[in-house]
Structure formats: C-alpha cells, structure tokens
A protein has these predicted regions:
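A short, Gly/Thr-enriched small/hydrophobic beta-strand-prone motif that recurs across taxa
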Residues: 75-86
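Conserved small/polar residues in nucleotide/adenosyl-binding loops
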Residues: 163-165
Length: 165
C-alpha cells in the first residue's frame, strides 16, 4: 500500500498485509495519516516505510516487525491508557484524584491536580484515552515517551512512572 502527498489525512484501518516482495505500507511525503488496527508481517523489504518528509503520522493497534524511517520523517505509536486504582486488598478505589503526564504534556488531571477531569468512578477507573508512547523521530530506532501517573487519596500522593512494553 503506497500513500503519498496526495493522500494526507487518511485513515488506514483493519488490514492484514503480508508476504509482499517489497513493502507492506509506504508513507511517502504523507502527513497526518492514521494506521488503525493493521497487521503487517513478512514483507521482504520492510513492513512499514516512512520516508521523504512524512510527518505527524500515527499508528494505533498496528503491529509490525520491521520499520524504516528516514531522516526527515516520523511516526508516533499511540496506545489506549487504561487505569484501574485498587487498594492493597484489591478493592476498587472511587473518588481518587488522578494526574497523567505524557512526557511534559498534561493528558488528564482531576481537581486536586488543577484540572477538570473526573476522579475515579465506583470501579476505580477513569475514561480510557489515547497516549503517545513511542516515537520514531527521523530514525528507525524507537524512543519511548515516558508516562507518569500521580494518584491522591485524602492524605497521600503517589507518583508512578510507567514503562511501556
């Protein structure tokens, strides 16, 4: 599948692309494209090739084993952030203040942390949302974007750093 500069702002969704003689998907001078829930495998050159000033492209739920990103392009991998707060006995904790930072970007904050997002519900959860967790920025080696979560209940605050696997 070849996506070029004419094809900006595209959504490529629910495809299985494998066993090709060349590439699975190529983004060539293509910007603001979303790859949703695709499976790319066993393509001879690369499963995914991002090239020639392709920027602001995102992949969500897309699996691949090989990628090429040239020195003028980028791809950000996003994932769903799911939070479940429980006490030491495993019971759900409702009404807990939450703050989620994606590197230096505030993604979620309830009132204690100066935001307007809801505290945890009766299940100890907040609404699921997307976060950026890996970027291929002008290279084929991924850089992990740190996610930090702060949790506050009455008289304690805990800060957690998440490692994406």
């Amino acid at each position: 599948m070849y996506i070029d500069s004419v094809d900006n702002d595209c959504k490529v969704e629910d495809n299985t692309i494998g066993n090709n003689d060349e590439y699975g998907i190529v983004l060539h001078s293509a910007n603001y494209n979303y790859l949703w829930n695709n499976t790319l495998y066993s393509n001879d050159l690369k499963d995914l090739q991002i090239e020639t000033q392709s920027s602001s492209n995102f992949a969500i739920g897309t699996t691949f084993s090989s990628i090429g990103v040239d020195g003028s392009s980028d791809l950000t991998i996003r994932e769903y952030f799911v939070l479940d707060v429980n006490d030491a006995s495993g019971n759900n904790m409702s009404g807990i203040d939450i703050k989620v930072m994606e590197d230096d970007t505030l993604k979620y904050a309830s009132s204690y942390f100066g935001g307007g997002d809801p505290k945890t519900d009766s299940y100890g959860t907040v609404e699921t949302f997307l976060i950026d967790y890996v970027i291929y920025d002008r290279e084929s080696t991924p850089t992990t974007i740190p996610t930090n979560v702060s949790v506050r209940s009455h008289d304690w605050v805990e800060i957690l750093s998440l490692i994406h696997i």
